[in-house]
Amino acid sequence: MRQIKSGFIIVALLALLAACSNDEEKRRYLPMLASNIENEVLVEVINGTRALSPTTLLRDSVFSVFGIESEKSLPVKVSVLEGKEVLSFRADLPDRTLMDLWDTDEGRRGEGYADSEITVQGAHIHLRFYYAFSALPRAELMRGGSTIALQTLEYQGQTINPYKRYGCFKIVLRRTPQGFTVE
């Protein structure tokens, strides 16, 4: 009986070690953090000249967002901007390995990007969100003093400067006979 227990423990330990060790190192997402994060994206979906109902798009499960860096579906909700319902999600922050950082007299600065894929009515829209980072000198010693914020996005090789107001970053997905455009 004792030999069976010992054998079982050895097999269990070997199985655990085999599961934990992998020839391929798993990629871990380590987002760039700051005390102030501006990564909310508002989305309006338009078919021709008519805005589609955000509530209906979510209810019918025909709108979703996937964060490429985090490898997760991102929560989407309905928000209101200037009296109009829009879809809203928080884009992935850039992974630390995707950040280019440098020091200045005013503190640390940086740029980076994170990719997301929006699926709307079966169409897949790949977007690259560009961020700017800034931190005051010795910001790590303060409760605050650093910001990472969305600046622009790229779609099909073109840079798009979205509508920005009240700290909001709004894009429009417009359905055309060829698919979607991003404005």
Segments the model singles out, each with a brief description of its role:
Residues 40, 60-62, 115:
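Exposed beta-strand and adjacent loop surfaces of beta-rich binding modules
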Residues 1-8:
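Bacterial N-terminal signal peptides that target proteins for export
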Residues 41-45:
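A short, amphipathic beta-strand motif
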Residues 16-19:
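C-terminal motif of bacterial Sec signal peptides marking the signal peptidase cleavage site
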Residues 27, 31-38, 48-60:
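N-terminal onset of structured domains
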Residues 21-37, 70-183:
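Extracytoplasmic cysteine-anchoring/structural motifs
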Residues 50-83:
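Short, ordered, surface-exposed loop/turn motifs in non-cytosolic proteins
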